[in-house]
Amino acid sequence: MLGDTEVLANLRVLQTELTGAGILEPLLSADGTTDVLVTAPDSVWVDDGNGLRRSQIRFADESAVRRLAQRLALAAGRRLDDAQPWVDGQLTGIGVGGFAVRLHAVLPPVATQGTCLSLRVLRPATQDLAALAAAGAIDPAAAALVADIVTARLAFLVCGGTGAGKTTLLAAMLGAVSPDERIVCVEDAAELAPRHPHLVKLVARRANVEGIGEVTVRQLVRQALRMRPDRIVVGEVRGAEVVDLLAALNTGHEGGAGTVHANNPGEVPARMEALGALGGLDRAALHSQLAAAVQVLLHVARDRAGRRRLAEIAVLRQAEGRVQAVTVWHADRGMSDDAAALHDLLRSRASA
């Protein structure tokens, strides 16, 4: 006969095995967690905004990791088995806050050391510029400059690596947009939640297990153009939708924005080239449209302590048919000799 204590313990184990994110849920629910990574039963890593650290969580064995990965894939409406050994998906209603989580999993033998799980927490980005400045994510010398970029309706892209804080900065800047402007945001996954009274959000949808029902970001950018936007925003530019976004920004929709993966501002033109090619835009046309459509790049990165911060502001210049990023402010060096280029842009918009 089992006593009450043993019965309750067994029920807790069963609940952990069958609901939510299992033993990973406390990590996912913790304040500040952005990523939880499983590389082996005894190797669970967490990023809480200060870089990756190894957690104390341990799975019983490889089978336990595999079961969790397959259950999460099923909850996301995806398939994960030997015939389909990797999966991308999105989970909703995780944790007390009911937040969303982006799921990626790979099964062995493709993952040679065992099932790998990568979970990205998609908490709504709600902080404003003042909060980021107070937290040290934006240098006081740059905070006013960032606000001026928004007020002047300059089109901008936030660039940076994975988990650098691109969406957080973008949301904060959108929160500084005048309340009488209408913002239409297009996202692959719902992350942007700026504090703005007139915000419309469109979120893409993956095809179901039968391969139907997909709604792409590119399709939604085209829909956004029909919704009388003052500003069009693409949460993450990573495909052929760059063609439609640049076209929108070149047809009277000033102050548009988005994020793009790049290690530094200088890499953004080449990154946009590659994305434009996916949409059938050749190199010359891409550079021509990019020069006319986007004025400013804001680069975010982690400092040596792993903290996210605004690291660099650059303007785009076109020379001999090619767009180049020119740094006007750097977190370690302050304003550059080219800062006048940004001030000229701001003055021209103020007098328009």
Curated annotation (Swiss-Prot):
Entry GO MF terms: ATP binding; ATP hydrolysis activity
Keywords from the named record: ATP-binding, Conjugation, Cytoplasm, Nucleotide-binding, Transport
GO cellular component, one term: cytoplasm
Induction comment: Expressed at a higher level in a phoP disruption mutant than in the wild type.
Effect of deleting the gene: Not essential for growth.
Subcellular location: Cytoplasm
Residues annotated for ATP binding in this entry: G160, G161, T162, G163, A164, G165, K166, T167
Family (UniProt): Belongs to the GSP E family.
PANTHER family: TWITCHING MOTILITY PROTEIN PILT, TYPE IV PILUS RETRACTATION ATPASE PILT
Protein name (record): Putative conjugal transfer protein Rv3659c
